[in-house]
């Protein structure tokens, strides 16, 4: 090994010693799966992938299988803590779900990550019950957003019914046997009235959303509120360069323009009539005025609050893993 390589390794070791995170390349992280088998087929992966998402079974095996192994260990230790606490108190304690938060920008792949984790965690030998909800369901309905002049701020913190989300998480953490989360439709771009997702006393709940790691500021006159992340036992941030996320967003917009936007009932049907050039300009304008602004102001600043950062390269593949030191 040459002097340059030694210097590079020394610099990396020094940086790691000062950072609150332990750094792994994808290959280093992948070795932590040990002999854990991959309980997922190619067909199942296709069903879990988000629209236009690029992910292979190799990446699932290298990144998500070791992560599911780590989380399974964490969940087991938490359940053991409840057992010994029950022994100490001399009475049975209610099981409390282990909550995992998944945060990151629009178009970075949060939904796919959340679905893969839910599936892998549910297939461990102890067969835990794993539920998944997205915070999109806690957006205010379009009617409310229009009344408040917030339609162009959709996805920003003020567009969410944060009190309802906090009540939901509080009920889950209190061990409520049945809790319901509202449902959001990307097709109609609105909350679906009367539709809910049941959360029935799971072992693990995965919560996916843009701003789930953000400290929420109470409105004037309101009492201080807990943060959404206060209810998390573990949190994950999906990271990538702005230029890459912008390109992925535009690519997804163009794909939707050729598919679901063509349905006359789709909220964004009008975009299906755009030329390719007009569609790129429109997607770029939406990205810059809404999604990039939200990323820079509200989402990216929360990255350091995560327990795990998954950093993607330009090809959408996870290249680096940063795990918070205990």
Swiss-Prot record:
Pathway(s) where this gene product acts: Cofactor biosynthesis; coenzyme A biosynthesis; CoA from (R)-pantothenate: step 1/5
Domain of life: Bacteria
EC number from the UniProt entry: 2.7.1.33
Single GO MF descriptor: ATP binding
Major location category of this protein: cytoplasm
Biological-process GO terms, alphabetical: coenzyme A biosynthetic process
Residues at which ATP binds: 104-111
A Pfam family recorded for this sequence: PRK
InterPro entries with a match to the protein in the record: P-loop_NTPase (IPR027417), PanK (IPR004566), PRK/URK (IPR006083)
Localization terms from the record: Cytoplasm
Protein name: Pantothenate kinase
Species this chain originates from: Parvibaculum lavamentivorans (strain DS-1 / DSM 13023 / NCIMB 13966)
Annotated gene: coaA
């Amino acid at each position: 090994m040459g002097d340059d390589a030694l210097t590079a390794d020394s610099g990396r070791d020094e940086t790691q010693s000062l950072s609150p995170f332990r750094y792994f390349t994808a290959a280093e992280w992948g070795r932590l799966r040990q002999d854990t088998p991959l309980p997922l087929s190619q067909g199942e992966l296709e069903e879990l992938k988000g629209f236009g998402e690029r992910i292979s079974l190799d990446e699932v095996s290298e990144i998500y299988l070791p992560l599911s192994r780590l989380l399974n260990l964490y969940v087991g230790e938490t359940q053991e803590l409840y057992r010994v606490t029950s022994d100490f108190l001399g009475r049975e304690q209610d099981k409390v779900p282990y909550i995992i938060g998944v945060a990151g920008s629009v178009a970075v792949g949060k939904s796919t990550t959340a679905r893969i984790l839910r599936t892998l965690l549910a297939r461990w030998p102890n067969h835990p019950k794993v539920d998944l909800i997205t915070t999109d369901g806690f957006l205010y309905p379009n009617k409310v957003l229009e009344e408040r002049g917030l339609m162009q701020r959709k996805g920003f913190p003020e567009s969410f019914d944060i009190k309802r989300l906090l009540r939901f998480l509080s009920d889950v953490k209190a061990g409520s046997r049945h809790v319901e989360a509202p449902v959001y439709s990307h097709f109609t771009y609105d909350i679906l009235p009367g539709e809910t997702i049941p959360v029935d006393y799971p072992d693990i709940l995965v919560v996916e959303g843009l701003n789930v790691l953000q400290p929420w500021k109470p409105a004037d006159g309101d009492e201080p509120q807990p943060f959404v992340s206060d209810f998390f036992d573990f949190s994950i941030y999906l990271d990538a360069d702005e230029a890459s996320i912008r390109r992925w967003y535009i690519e997804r917009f163009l794909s939707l323009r050729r598919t679901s936007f063509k349905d006359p009932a789709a909220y964004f049907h009008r975009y299906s009539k755009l030329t390719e050039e007009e569609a790129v300009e429109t997607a770029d304008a939406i990205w810059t005025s809404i999604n990039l602004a939200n990323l820079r102001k509200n989402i990216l600043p929360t990255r350091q609050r995560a327990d795990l950062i998954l950093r993607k390269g330009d090809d959408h593949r996870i290249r680096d893993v940063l795990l918070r030191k205990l």
